[in-house]
């Protein structure tokens, strides 16, 4: 019927937060540049949607992808406009400063995960075949005590 009802926001908009601009740094873009692009995406693409649109982010709390991510898995855009610090009325420069303030270093595993996401990996059957190997208790003990 042409009415927007939901948006899948990936790692751009979380419940209570937005994504990290430092995890996708390219050679020609700084984290400030990427934070500015985040501001533009939020203001020009997401925030103009109706307040009753349901926001479904890629994931919630428990990851290092945001500073104030909620445990909730969905919310209305209208409520996020009221409660999410990143959707408040601030200038682009203020937004960038807020977003970059207090960001923790990227998790150690991030580069490997990003490479896997970009390049792909073997089939699930192959992962099971090569990754599920029984260990004798002695072998496990040696691995733990290294």
Model-derived features: positions:
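Flexible, polar/low-complexity N-terminal or interdomain linker segments that lie immediately upstream
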Residues: 82-83, 87-146
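Metallo-beta-lactamase
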Residues: 1-108
